[in-house]
Amino acid sequence: MEAVAKYDFKATADDELSFKRGDILKVLNEECDQNWYKAELNGKDGFIPKNYIEMKPHPWFFGKIPRAKAEEMLGKQRHDGAFLIRESESAPGDFSLSVKFGNDVQHFKVLRDGAGKYFLWVVKFNSLNELVDYHRSTSVSRNQQIFLRDIEQVPQVHGGDRATNLLQQPTYVQALFDFDPQEDGELGFRRGDFIQVVDNSDPNWWKGTCLGQTGMFPRNYVTPVNRNM
């Protein structure tokens, strides 16, 4: 994930990362600490205070979903090139690109060089976002012409198992207030946190993921996030 720095930050410890307001940081790990993320900037990495940045969620980033789930979701898409990026199951901290082509789903390991740049083949990029944009017009495969295109929203199925109401494209909301869980299965968060919604079939309680945790939360505690931010 990427984040925009809201303020200047000067590191006060060897494991912290300095940055300036407006810098685009690569967030490497959101689960290290409640108040600190691990991030990278200009080939250097370190810890940054979470309240100094604003996350930039992308509709194609699905986080920690299994390879099998990615194949199931993309298998329902009509068009070749429908894709998502997910965190690698076999190599924590790395990413995989899953793309629909024909009746199959192909998986590409997103590689990184010593300077922290991302690439699939030869051309390298400073961010996943740049890599995705490039491969919208340049094939991700050397064997077929496969151009990335955003997945389509699959209409929700009313009734039946709640699992059928999972969103097929990630929708993000931002917390307006702090929410502390009162029951098992509820999702706690702090004001300003970004939440990925995975089920919005209930008018009052939605299911989402935040900082590696999944659970239910009250709809009136959040506000939609612009997909194009």
Curated annotation (Swiss-Prot):
Matches recorded under InterPro entries: Grb2-like, GRB2_C_SH3, GRB2_N_SH3, SH2, SH2_dom_sf, SH3-like_dom_sf, SH3_domain
Keywords: Cytoplasm, Developmental protein, Endosome, Golgi apparatus, Meiosis, Nucleus, Repeat, SH2 domain, SH3 domain
Protein's recorded name: Growth factor receptor-bound protein 2
PANTHER family tied to this protein: PROTEIN ENHANCER OF SEVENLESS 2B (PTHR46037)
SMART domains in UniProt: SH2 (SM00252), SH3 (SM00326)
Domain SH2: 60-171
GO BP annotation list: insulin receptor signaling pathway; meiotic cell cycle
Entry's free-text remark on domains: The two SH3 domains and the SH2 domain are necessary for the reinitiation of oocyte meiosis.
GO MF, any single term: insulin receptor substrate binding
Subcellular location: Nucleus; Cytoplasm; Endosome; Golgi apparatus
Domain SH3: 1-58, 168-227
Free-text function comment from the UniProt entry: Adapter protein that provides a critical link between cell surface growth factor receptors and the Ras signaling pathway. Promotes meiotic reinitiation during oocyte maturation.
Pfam families per the UniProt record, alphabetical: SH2, SH3_1
Any one Gene Ontology cellular component term annotated for this protein: endosome
Database matches in CDD domains: SH2_Grb2_like (cd09941), SH3_GRB2_C (cd11949), SH3_GRB2_N (cd11946)
SUPFAM superfamilies in the record: SH2 domain, SH3-domain
